Amino acid sequence: MARRLAGVCTLTALVACGEAGPTLAEREAAARAAQEAADQAMRQRTRAAREADRLAAAWRYQQATIGGGAQVTAAIFAAEDVDTDGHGARAVQLVFRDHEEWGRSAYLVLEAGDFACRPRCTVQVSADDREPQPLAAWRPETDEAIAMFIEGTAAFWRLTGDAARLTIAFPVTAGGTRTATFDVAGLDESKMPGW
């Protein structure tokens, strides 16, 4: 009996001193907090996966025979349309091309307006928050497409592959320069073998 009483007294003393552990309300609050943290982590993973899918879907890859040779392209539109001719914002596209006879090239395509880049010009290219880099460019003597080729294709490709966002400032015939920003993080480099 004395032993039993000593155990009860010890238990009572522990409870009275607050060493019995968290209360039911505290345990429930901790469980809710843990569940909220797990739910938040799941929402973040879902958002990240959705964003990765969006970025990957922004790129278009094509294989075709053009001009008698096999060609592979990776193309993406600017995140926002750009007013290149003073008549409203239109799409600007960035294309990487590998043609078995013409070689590798990178170029911009406008839906309206034109590049002020005949015979040559300089564009400013920046990756993410890095300082802009000047790259030589040129506009071919053709009216088949409104395209401007960017030189230093290999370096430009590497810059694109390392970036989440690529910003290109280019001159236009409407006057001044325009800037197009491309969300390039979803680039699948395996679609352009050998680059």
Language model segments and positions:
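Sec-dependent bacterial lipoprotein signal peptides
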Residues: 1-15
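A generic "folded-domain core" signal
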Residues: 18-195
